[in-house]
Amino acid sequence: MSQDPFALLKAEVDLLGRLLGEAIRTLSGERFFALVEEVRALAKARRQGDEAAGEALLARVEGLSTEEAEALVRAFTHYFHLVNLAEERHRVRVNRLRAQAETLESPRPEGFLALAKALKERGLSLEEAEAHLNRLELLLTFTAHPTETRRRTLRHHLEALQRELEAGDRERLAARVALLYGTEEVRKARPTVEDEIKGGLYYLPTTLWEAVPRVVAGLEAALERVYGRRPRLKSPVRFRSWIGGDRDGNPFVTPEVTAFAGRYAREVARRRFLEALEDLVRDLSLAEARVPVPREVRERGEGVERFMGEPYRRYFAALYRALEREEATTEGLLAALKAAERGLREVGLGRVAEAFLDPLEARLSAFGLELAPLDLREESGRLLEAAAELLRVGGVHPDFLALPQEERERLLTEELKTARPLLPVGEAPEGEALRVALGALKAWRDKGAHVVSMTHHPEDLLAVFLLAREVGLYRPGRPLPFDVVPLFETLEDLRRAPGVLRRLLENPVFLAHARGRGGVEVMIGYSDSNKDAGFLMANLALYEAQEALSRVGEEVGLPVYFFHGRGTSTARGGGPAGRAIASLPPRSVGRRIRLTEQGEALADRYSHPDLAVRHLEQMLYHFALAALGPGQEPEARWREALAQAAEESTRRYRALLQEEGFFDFFEAFTPIREIGELPIASRPVYRRGRVRDIRDLRAIPWVMAWTQVRVLLPGWYGLSALEELPLDLLREMYRGWPFFASTLEAAAMALAKADMGVARLYLRLVPEPLRFFYRRLAEEHARTVALLEAVFQAPLLHNQRTLERQIRLRNPYVDPINIVQVELLRRYRAPGGKEDEALRRALLLSILGVAAGLRNAG
């Protein structure tokens, strides 16, 4: 077989396709296999411009029974699962080839060697480079996502297929494909939060467990190649989780669920570290008669009866016993590892320490015994409601919420000067908000941060201090044992954020806390800002907010660390994470940065250790260089021009949303209501009943609905406002301003993935008087594509050829799923459709199929 990576990819896709065909024949019969082939051929012909084939395809789909439609969608969806698997293997092969080809003179772009060279070229000594890298904290926060709906059973089969492909055993491969095809894809019931916790943390003790030591070793080896000496680095990557602590809008995240999330993560971590210590007991069989041993190692192992004369085995057996009894701490285990490592290096066994102890040390510094400390997130209104009940019961104020905003802040600040609890001893809270808030704080063991969504004023955060005091976590003048993080989401809140932070840092309670914590963490939301103001304004507002918030921190002498609430779609801040970091404002990147890792993106980034290493490598490359200091400021005239265009962009976006009939069109044209009714996620889709305003919808379903119909509106609509600027100026900004270039390239991805021809099929579901909205969207799409290609002086995906090829090859196979989905929606919305369980199942499968085909859902 040819060693050309693309030839190997094509061969694997062809093989998996043939095996799927065999499974379809075996389990569904020749007649159904012929239907699949007929639909595939018609879809390809339609894609090539054959109108008759398109009409024939529509007629064929209309004539299918619900069972046939479901089976057809399942066949194409399984095809995409297999193609996605082959593409992941292709990425692994390409990564390995590029890594093998790199030299000191020609390092791989965005790699560890390129980073080491860049650090030296910027004048850093090895000691300075080592200190800089050891200061960095890249915090990746795992969140649940409604479109990561694959059952764990499917994930098991896909991972087994990876192994069968590696082994090259065609018979086992065929058997596994048959098992995959015969497995039910759709959940019978809506996933519980416990399901999401188990699924969301899956990659931490598996592929990331393998990847983290390789990241640390890769950085050390790169610095050794460039500087001539190997440094000692800890893991710059850490992990957090929201799954089981994110209470914002999710009534199913109870204090009991929060307690379960902590227990589950800690138990998973404990099992993995026990296995690692067991390996060390087995491997480090050094005899005391042959190797000098430090006193600390000898004494720690004296209580172990086995392994006489083998002090390192006894030492690690003692550590194993302490961890088994839950008497160990992360810090204690790290100190014990370092002691053993020193002992080995002192007698010339540095290689043994490097091979056997360093990987465990990297894992301990990355995961700790908590695996991923849990964040709590709650909406500010709920926290104030809880605080109001506490103040009423404690006799402080009968109606806190009726007070003016400044008076609420003053009252809380005064109250927090004392340590007294307000709830009478033994009395349970009456109100649900207070019961849940206090219950969550009590259940919260391994503390990440407490994120306050929809932060508007300082008292939104001070409410957390009051509640924490009630459960013994706050004492006046001292910092809380966790960060309290304001989350600014809407356009208005992003613009007010610098003023809110300034007032927080003037507040004695919060200032003492921030100084004790060594800085302030601020979260900025990419989803709601886009939903509120449109793509261009949201991106600019986020950029300007980071600049202004950083300046506020500088004025007070405290660093501001940003937590970027990015999604996977362009509309929600998606795209290559490394490039996104490179495009952040100068001076906004400190020694710590946090990013959300959405459930939907986890398989794409972490399904294989090699992919995980490369993803982390690219992020660390850009983060380490950005954290060195300010980059080049954009020119004032560029800022002025973009601000002007962004205002016009928002005007156009909001005019569309506010036009009479738009949300009636949206509900008819997209499967938004069905997404809310089907068992996709634990969190409700709607903030309020029917959609009459954009505020009635959560951001993820808004984006997901537009993705399903292949419009991807939130990722580009309104961008044509840039046409009001001179083309030469736009080209100059694109070449010279990384943020602007990143923004346009993200929009180009969404525009390229959109397909207005497929979207037009959904007009069958829309009443005639509302169909003009589609024509407007199609015209705006064409106009925006033309504008960006003029700015780039090249096709939309001129610098993303792999993605361009992927879209071109996938579209003919996604199209049939969309065509079937239109017919299923028509039937589902007809009288009696919602009672048809087979129809519900088929419709859900079509939503999953489009998500699998596009490799992005919202």
Curated annotation (Swiss-Prot):
UniProt catalytic activity: oxaloacetate + phosphate = phosphoenolpyruvate + hydrogencarbonate
Catalytic residues (positions): H145, K531
Enzyme Commission code: 4.1.1.31
Keyword check for Magnesium: yes
A matching Pfam family: PEPcase
Gene Ontology terms for molecular function: magnesium ion binding; phosphoenolpyruvate carboxylase activity
Source species, domain of life: Bacteria
InterPro entries, per the entry: PEP_COase, PEP_COase_bac/pln-type, PEP_COase_Lys_AS, PEPCASE_His_AS, Pyrv/PenolPyrv_kinase-like_dom
The keyword Lyase is assigned to this record: yes
Gene Ontology CC: cytosol
Cofactor: Mg(2+)
Top-level EC class: lyase
GO biological process per UniProt: carbon fixation; oxaloacetate metabolic process; tricarboxylic acid cycle
UniProt entry keywords in alphabetical sequence: Carbon dioxide fixation, Lyase, Magnesium
Function summary: Forms oxaloacetate, a four-carbon dicarboxylic acid source for the tricarboxylic acid cycle.
Family in the record: Belongs to the PEPCase type 1 family.
Protein name (Swiss-Prot/TrEMBL): Phosphoenolpyruvate carboxylase
Species in which this protein is naturally found: Thermus thermophilus (strain ATCC 27634 / DSM 579 / HB8)
